[in-house]
Amino acid sequence: MNVQQTQQQQAMAAQQQSMVAQQQQQIAQQQSAIAQQQIAQQQQIAQQQQIAQQQQQHQQHQQHQQQHQQQQQHQQQHQQQQHIQQQQQPQQQQPQQQQSQQQQQQHQQQQQPQQQQPPQQQQQQPPQQQQQPQQQQQQQQQQQQQPQQQQQQQQQDQLSGVTGKIRDLNESIWIHLGGYAESIGEQDKALASYENALRHNPFSIKALTQIASLFRIKEQYSKAAEYFQRIVTIESKNGEVWGALGHCYLMMDDLQKAYTAYQQALYHLPNPKDPNLWYGIGILYDRYGSYDHAEEAFTAVLKMDNKFEKSTEIYFRLGVLYKHQGKYDQSLEYFQHLVKNPPLPLTTSDIWFQIGHVYELQKEYHKSKDAYEKVLKDNATHSKVLQQLGWLYHHNPLFTNQEYAINYLMRSIDSDSSDAQTWYLLGRCYMTQQKYKKAYDAYQQAVYRDGRNPTFWCSIGVLYYQINQYRDALDAYTRAIRLNPFLSEVWYDLGTLYESCHQHTDSLDAYQRAAELDPHNKHIQSRLATLRAQVSGKPIGKDGYDLQNGEHGEHGGKSTPMIIEPNSPGTGAMESLGKGGQNNRNGNNNGNNSFVPELAEINSHLPEDMRNNSSLPSSNELNSSLIDRKTERGRGEDMHNSHHSQYSNSMSMNNMNNNNNNMNMNNNMNNNMNNMNNNNNNMNSMNNMNNNNNNINNNMSNNNNNNHNNHQMNQYNNNNNNSNINNNNNNHHNMNDNVNSKNNDVLDRRYKGILEREKTSPNGDGRDNRDNIRDNRDNRDSRDGRDNRDGRDSRDRIQEYTREYNNNNNNNNSISSINNNNNNNNNNYNNNNNNNNNNNNNNNNNGLRATSPLPSHNDRRSYERDNKERINNNNNNNNNMNNNMNNNMNNMNNNNNNSNISRFEHQNNRTSSPFENNSNNNNNNNNNNNNNINYNNIGQRALSPQSSQHKDRREIILDEESDINERSKTRSPSIVKEAEEKRETVIVDKERSPTPIITEKPDEKQVEKVTDKESSLVEKVDKENEKESPSSSSSSKEIEKETEKEKEKEKEKEKEVEKEVEKEIENDKEKEKEKEVEKDVEENKSVEKSSEKPVEKESTTTTTNDEDEEGELSEPTTTTKKDDSSKLPTDEKKLSSVSPTTTAVEQSRDETKELEMDTKEDSEKEKKSSTTTTAAASESVKPIDEEKKSPTTTTTTTTNTTTVEPTHKDKESSKNDDTTTTTTTTTTKSAKSPNSSPTRSDEVVEPHQDASQEEINKRKLEDDITSTPSKRLKPDSTPSSATTASTPSEQPESPLKKENPVGETLSPEIKDSKSSSSSSSSSSSSTNTGSSSTNSSAKNERDRDRERERERERDREREREREREREREREKNKQPTRAPIKPSSRKLER
C-alpha cells in the first residue's frame, strides 16, 4: 500500500510539473506577443514625434519672418516723423523777434506733448492692426494641432492600459508562483515571489498579507507587524488584519498595543465570535495575570468551535490556570487528558512535569518525586525538572538533603545556564548550609540574568541580614520595594531589620504595612502584637508569643526574616516555552506567592571555619557590577567549577594552623631530647675528666647528683609540655566564650548611624533620645570599621581579647623554644624575643581580621587578598620558629663543645689537684643545671593556671609603654655619652693599677687535706637535700596562709619604696653636683695609695658589646664574682679607696637603704620557710642569674687579668668584636649577724596594680638621670662590698616575664671565663678557704630555694587579684547600649 501511494504521489507530482511547464510556455508566448505589440507601438509613437517636430520648426520660421517685417516698418515711420518736425520750424532773422519767438517756442514746446500725442497714437495704430492677423494665424495653427494632440492622448491611454494589464498579469503570475512555492513548503522562494509581486504593485494587499503570514509562521513577529501595519494604513476597517496585528504585538510582549489592536478587531469584524481572536485575548489576560478573564476567554473558544485546531493547547493553558488558582483537582484532570496527546511543541515529559508540580503543591511529595523521575527517564537533561527536584530536596521536611539539592541544581545549570531561577534556588540551598560566600555568588548570577525580580533582591537582603551587614540589607530591601511595593514579605523582613536594631517605631510601621498587604497571615499578626506589647510595656500573653523567633522579646534573639517562595514553573504563555518545555519567564505574579518554611535561626557569631565566608561585597558593588556584564558567563562557569571543590584558601589556612601546632609540639619534644643529650654529654665529659685524675669516689657522687638533676629536669620539661598543650586549649575555649559573650554588643554598636533618620532605641518608658544620638555618630572608615569614640566599645574589647589570646599562644610557643636554650647568651635571648614579638604582631592582625565585624563596603577582591596575607604571615611565622629552633640547637652544641675543649686544654696546660678538677666539674655542671632550671621555671610560671587568664587592658598598655621607654633610653644621646665616659675611666684605671700575675703552685699536702674535708661536706649536703625533698611537697593551704601574710608586708614595703622614690628624685640634682667633687677626690686617693703599696683589686668583668640586631647600644657591663678558695687579709677602708669606677659611691648610697629592708624581711622569712616549704619546690626552681655573696670570717684579694676571645658567634645576631675582660677576685671581711642574709639579684620590686602611670614614669626618669641600675632591680652585693662598682647593661625586659632582667643573666662565654679564673685562683689558696667556701655555698643554695618559692607565691597572688578586677569590669559592661537605624520605612513608600 505504501508503494502504491508513493507511486500515485509521484504521478501527481509529474502531472503538476507538466501543468506548470505548460503554464510557463503560455506565459512565455503571451510575453512575446506583448513584446511585439510594444515594439510596434513604439515605432508609431516615434513617427508621430518626428512629424510634430517638423511642424514646430515650420511655425518657428514663419514667426521669425513676421518679426523682421515689423522692424522695417517701425524704422520708416521714425524717419517720416523727423522730416515733418524739420519743416515746421520757421527761420528767425531779426534779433528783436528772436526773443518773442523764443518765448513762443517755449510756450509751444510746453504744448507740444499734448499736441503730439494724437499723432503718436495714430502712428501706433498700424502695428496693432498688423498683429491681429498674426494671432489669427496662430489660432488656426492650434486648431490644426488639436486633432493631433487628441490622437497622441488616445495612443498614450492605450499604452497605459496595455502596461497596466501587463503589471496585473505579472502580479498575478508572481502571486501564483508564491502560492505554489508555499504549498510545496519552500517559504524562502514564496517570500521572493511575493516581493517581486510588490515591485509591480506596491499596494497589493494579497502580497502583503501573504508576506506577513509567512513572517508570523517563522516567528519573526516584528517584521510581520510591519506588513500588517501597512495593510491597516491602506484598509483601516479590516478586522481580520487588526486581530493578526494584535497577536503579533502579544508575542512581542507589547501588551498595550496588543490590547488596542484586539479592540479595533472586535469593532470592525462583522462577527466578533471568532475563536482565533478570543484565543489571543485569553493569552493576553493570562499575561496580565487576570486568570479569571483568561479562563472565560479560553472556555468561550471551546464553545465557539469544539474542533478548534489549538484545543489541546487551550486544555494545557487551562490546567496551568487552575493550578495557579488552587483548583488542583481540575488541573490534574486537564493534564492527565493531555498525557497521550500533548500539544506541540510539548511532549509527554512536559505534561508529567506539570503533574509532579501539582502534586508538590498538594504536599504529596512522594507522588511528585515519582512524576519527576519519570521525566528524567525520558530526558535526563530536562532543566526545569532538575530545578524542581533540587528545590524539593531543599525544603521538603520528609527527605531533606542539601547535597542532593545542590547536585540537581548544578545539573540544571549545565543544561540551561541562562535560567535565573535555578541560580536563585542554588543560593537558597547555600544559605541553609551557612555558606554565605557561595550564596552571594549564586544570587549575583541570578540578578545578572533578571535584575528586576524583587524576589531575588529580597533574598539578597536576607543574606546581608544574616551576616549582620545591616546597611547592605536595607539597600536590598529598598530595591525590592521599588520594584514591587505590594509584597508583604519584603515589608516583614524590613520590620525585622528595624527590630534587630531596637528601632521599634519604624519596625511597627513596616509590620503594619505587611499586615495590610496580607491580613490573613497569623505570623505577621502575632509578631505585630508582641512588638506593640513590648513598646507599651504591657505583659505579653501566650497568644502573643512568637515561638519561632524567641519567647523573650528582644532578649530572645533576633527574629528570623520571612523568605519568599520562588515562582512555580510553567506559568508563562505557551509561546514562551521552548522545545524542551523550559519556561524562562520569572514574573512575580503580583505577589501571589505562598510562604515556605523559614530558615533556622543563625547565631550572630560564625564558627572559625566559616569566618572567611562572612565578608561579602556591598550592595553598591553588586549594583555597579550589573552595569558591566562582560564577565557574566565566566563568573557562572567559575561558580559551577567551585561547587565540586572546597575553598582552597580556608583549607590552606587550617593546614597552616595545624602545622604551627605540630611544630610547637615537635619543638617541645626536640627541646627535651636536646636537654637530655646535653646532660648526658656533660656526664660523659665529667667521667672522662675524673678518670684522667683517678678520682673514682668523687665521680660517683657527681654522677648521682647529675642523674638526680637530670631526672628533675626531664620532669620539668614534660610538665611544661603538658601545660603548654592544656593552656593552649584553655585559652582557645576562653577566647571563644569571650567572643560569644561580646558579639551581640558588636553587632549593635557597629552599625550605629545606618539609616538617614536620627532615632534612638526607646528606653524603658518608650521615649526616644533623638537629640543625644547626633553627638554619638560614628566617624568610621568603610574598610576596617573602627569606631572613633571616647568610650570603650565592645569592638575594642573583642580586639583586646583576640590580642591577649594570640599573645598567650605565642608566649607559650616562645616558652617552649626557650626551654631549649640552656647556654644561650644575652644576644640570642633578645633575638628570640624579637622574633616572638613579630609573631605576635602577625597573629594579632590575623585575629582581628577574623573576629572583627563585617565591613559594609568591602572590595570584591579583598577576600582573596586577605587570604594571601594570612598565608604569607603564617609562612613568616613558621620560618621564624624554624630559625629560632636552629639557632638554639647550634648555640647549645657550640657551647657544650667549647666548654669541653676549654676544660681539656686547661687540664693539659697545668697540673692540678683532684680537688681542683672536681670543683671545676661541679661548677660547670651546676651552671648548666641551674640554667636549665631557670628556663624551665620561666616556662612553668608563664604556663601556670593563673597566667593563662587574659591580661587586663591597663597592664597591656603599661607593658607597651615600658618597652617603648626602655628602648628610647638605650638610644638616647645622654646614655651614649655616659657609656663613653665609663669606658675612658676603665682604661685609665687599667693603666694606673699594677696587675701582678701569680705563678705559684699549691702544696700537694694542703690539697689532700682539703679533698677529705670536701668529701665529708658533700655527704652532709646530700643528706640535707634528701631531708628537704619530702618537705617540699607541703599542702597548698599552708602556702595560701603564708602568701596572705607576705602580701600585707609587700604592700607596706611598696608604700615605703614609693616615698623613697619621691625623695630621691628631689636629691638627684644635688647628687650630680657631688659626683664631680667625689670623682676628683677618689682619683687622687687611688693614685696616692697605688704609689704607696700595690693593692689587689676586686675582680670586675667589663664587656663592651656592639649594637645588637635592632641597632640598640648596650652599655659596658661590669659583674663581680667571689672566689671561695682565695684568702688574703684586707680592710674595708682600703677596699673603699680602690674602686675601679666612679659610680661606686652613688650606688652604695642607693643600695644601703634597700639592703636594710631586705635583711629584716629575709630574717623573718627564714624562720617560716624552715618549717614549711611549698609544693611548687618539687616541680620548679627559680632561675639563678648570678652567684650570691655570703659573709665570711676571713678575706683575701687576688688580682688576675686575662683577655678572652669570643668563642661563638650567633648566626642570627650581629657579630660582636673581641671582648676584653679584666677579672679580679675579692672577699670582704664582715661580722656574721643573725639578721644578715644573702641578697637576691633576681627579685623585682614591682609597683602595685593600682599604681598610677606617673609613678612608673618617675622611676624611668630617675634611671635616665642617675644612669644607675633601675630601682625596680635590687642591688647585687652586700653592704661590705658597696665600693665595688657594677654597671649592668640596660636592656629591654623580656615580654614573657618582667621579673627576669636580661641585663643580669650571664652569657656562656662569661661563665666559662669565670670558671677558669676561679680554677686559676684556687692554686694559690689555702685549706681553710675551701672549708669556709663550702659551708657558705650550701647555706646560700638553701636560701635561694626558699626565696624562689616565696616569689612564686607572690606572683600567684598578683594574678588572682587581676582576675578579680577583670570579673568586676565584665559585670559592668554586660548591658551595652544599642545602635539605632536611621531612615524610616515611611520614606521608602515615597
From Swiss-Prot:
Similarity section: Belongs to the CYC8/SSN6 family.
Query: What induces this protein's gene, according to its Swiss-Prot or TrEMBL record?
Result: Expressed at the vegetative stage and at an early developmental stage, although at a lower level.
What's the source species for this entry? Dictyostelium discoideum (Social amoeba)
Any one cellular-component term (Gene Ontology):
nucleus
Q: Does the keyword Transcription apply?
A: yes
Alphabetized PROSITE patterns for the sequence: TPR, TPR_REGION
Chief site of localization? nucleus
Biased composition of type Low complexity is found at 582-593, 644-744, 805-846, 872-898, 917-937, 1170-1180, 1192-1203, 1219-1228, 1277-1289, 1315-1337
**What InterPro entries does the database record attribute to this sequence?**
Corepressor-Demethylase (IPR051630), TPR-like_helical_dom_sf (IPR011990), TPR_2 (IPR013105), TPR_rpt (IPR019734)
Q: Please give the function described in this protein's UniProt entry.
A: Acts as a component of the trfA-tupA corepressor complex which is involved in the repression of many genes in a wide variety of physiological processes. May also be involved in the derepression of at least some target genes. The complex is recruited to target genes by interaction with DNA-bound transcriptional repressors.
Q: Where is the composition biased (Basic and acidic residues)?
A: 540-557, 632-641, 745-803, 857-871, 977-993, 1000-1029, 1037-1099, 1120-1135, 1147-1169, 1206-1218, 1240-1263, 1339-1374
Residue ranges for the region (Disordered) are: 53-143, 539-596, 632-938, 958-1390
Superkingdom is Eukaryota
Indicate, by first and last residue, each region the UniProt record lists as having compositional bias (Polar residues). Answer: 1136-1146, 1229-1239
What subcellular compartments does it reside in? Nucleus
Q: How does it assemble?
A: Associates with tupA to form the trfA-tupA corepressor complex.
Q: Could you provide one GO biological process annotation from this protein's UniProt record? A: regulation of gene expression
Q: Does the keyword Transmembrane apply?
A: no
The record's listing under Gene3D superfamilies reads: Tetratricopeptide repeat domain
Keywords per UniProt: Nucleus, Repeat, Repressor, TPR repeat, Transcription, Transcription regulation
Record's protein name: General transcriptional corepressor trfA
* GO MF terms held by the record: chromatin DNA binding; RNA polymerase II cis-regulatory region sequence-specific DNA binding
TPR repeat ranges are 171-204, 206-238, 239-272, 275-308, 312-345, 349-382, 384-419, 420-453, 454-487, 489-521
